[in-house]
Every structure is written in C-alpha cells, then in structure tokens.
C-alpha cells in the first residue's frame, strides 16, 4: 500500500485526529468531510475501531502499510516493555520524526522532505533516509549550506515547546535524543493496544 499524499486536513477530519500536529484541521470542522460529515459517524465494529486506530497512527507518521507493519513486527521482538509502547518508541526514533520533534520542520511531511533532499546530518554525516533509526546521543543537525532555508528558520521560530526527551541548540541548529521516550511522553490520543489487537488477529 502506498503512502497517502492527498490533503492531510481531509484525512484528519475523517479519522478525527490532527495528523499535522497543529490541530488546525479540526478547529473549525471537527467532523468527517462531505455533505453529511456532521452526522455520519455511527458506531464502529470492533474491527473498525482497531483499523481506524491503526490508520490514525500510520498516517500520523506518514508511512506505507508495509513500513508500518514491518516496524510493528520488530517491536514485538524487543524483550523489555510492552509491544505497543515499544512500537511507538520505534516510531518516535525515525529520523523524519526527530527532525519534526526538534522543531526543524512544522510537520512530519515537511521533515521527511528535508531528510529526502539531503538537508540533514546525523553525527556529521548526511543521511537522506527518513526511516533511519536515531540512537540516544546522536547529533541531528542541519547541513551548513541549508541553514538559511526559510522553511527551517520559520519552523524554529514557530516552536512553542519541545518534548522532554530531546535537547536543541538554536544557534547551531542541532539537537539530539537525550533518552528513549516513555509512554507518557508520547501521543495520548492513540490507544496502541487496539493496534496490537488488530495485527494479532
């Protein structure tokens, strides 16, 4: 299954969650798109509820189904912790997500483009793979020739707060993952237990 590239605001309203992280999609119309979106939400089946939760998280991180399910399998092989929490930690450690969490981009989609276009380095080496798994202590930075990009400067200026598990140097435009995130650090709107149930059927 390919990555969704349509309008994120429409998908956000359909799933009932802000995929961009800004909340703007749901501010004016907190219901599904379409002529009858305001009264179209009926009771979902157990499978439908699990599927919607899975889709919410997958689209939030901008991944294909294959990428998403493969990472889920990897999370299941980690011996410590719960499957669901380990899965969410692996999602958070993706390079595109870390670029977003550091505030170098306003959305994960924008962060993925920065990585794809070679604007980001890890420990001084250019990395253009969005799914690259960031380790604790690795330094994520903007390449010297990319530091004057308006999209990056605008994103940094717009940051209100950053997660407790990262630190950032605005002068150097670099930061790092200081520790692995705990469940309470991550999205409270996601019920990962439903996703575990979906894949374990």
Swiss-Prot record:
User: What Pfam family is a match, any one?
Assistant: S4
**Keywords, alphabetical:** Ribonucleoprotein, Ribosomal protein, RNA-binding, rRNA-binding
Gene3D superfamilies per the UniProt record, alphabetical: Ribosomal Protein S4 Delta 41, Chain A, domain 1, RNA-binding S4 domain
What biological processes does GO assign it?
ribosomal small subunit biogenesis; translation
Give the GO cellular component terms, alphabetically: small ribosomal subunit
Q: Where is the S4 RNA-binding domain?
A: 93-153
Give the residue spans that cross the bilayer.
Answer: none
Transmembrane found in the keyword field: no
For region Disordered, the annotated ranges are 22-47
In alphabetical order, the GO MF annotations are: rRNA binding; structural constituent of ribosome
- The reply on keyword Transmembrane is no
UniProt family annotation: Belongs to the universal ribosomal protein uS4 family.
Q: What does this protein do?
A: One of the primary rRNA binding proteins, it binds directly to 16S rRNA where it nucleates assembly of the body of the 30S subunit.
Q: How does it assemble?
A: Part of the 30S ribosomal subunit. Contacts protein S5. The interaction surface between S4 and S5 is involved in control of translational fidelity.
How is this protein named in the record?
A: Small ribosomal subunit protein uS4
| Organism taxonomic ancestry | Bacteria, Bacillati, Bacillota, Bacilli, Lactobacillales
The gene designation is: rpsD
């Amino acid at each position: 299954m390919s990555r969704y590239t349509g309008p994120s605001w429409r998908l956000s309203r359909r799933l009932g969650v802000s995929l961009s992280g800004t909340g703007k999609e749901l501010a004016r119309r907190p219901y599904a798109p379409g002529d009858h979106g305001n009264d179209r939400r009926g009771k979902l089946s157990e499978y439908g509820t699990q599927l919607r939760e899975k889709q919410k998280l997958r689209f939030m991180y901008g991944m294909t189904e294959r990428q998403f399910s493969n990472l889920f399998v990897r999370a299941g092989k980690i011996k410590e912790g719960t499957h669901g929490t380990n899965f969410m930690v692996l999602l958070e450690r993706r390079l595109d997500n870390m670029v977003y969490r550091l505030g170098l981009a306003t959305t994960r989609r924008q962060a993925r483009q920065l990585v794809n276009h070679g604007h980001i380095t890890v420990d001084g080496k250019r990395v253009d793979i969005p799914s690259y798994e960031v380790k604790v202590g690795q330094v994520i930075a903007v390449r010297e020739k990319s530091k004057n990009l308006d999209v990056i400067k605008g994103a940094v200026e717009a940051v209100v707060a950053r997660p407790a598990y990262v630190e950032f140097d605005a002068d150097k435009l670099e930061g790092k993952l200081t520790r692995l995130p705990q469940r309470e650090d991550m999205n409270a709107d996601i019920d990962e237990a439903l996703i575990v149930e979906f894949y374990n059927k």
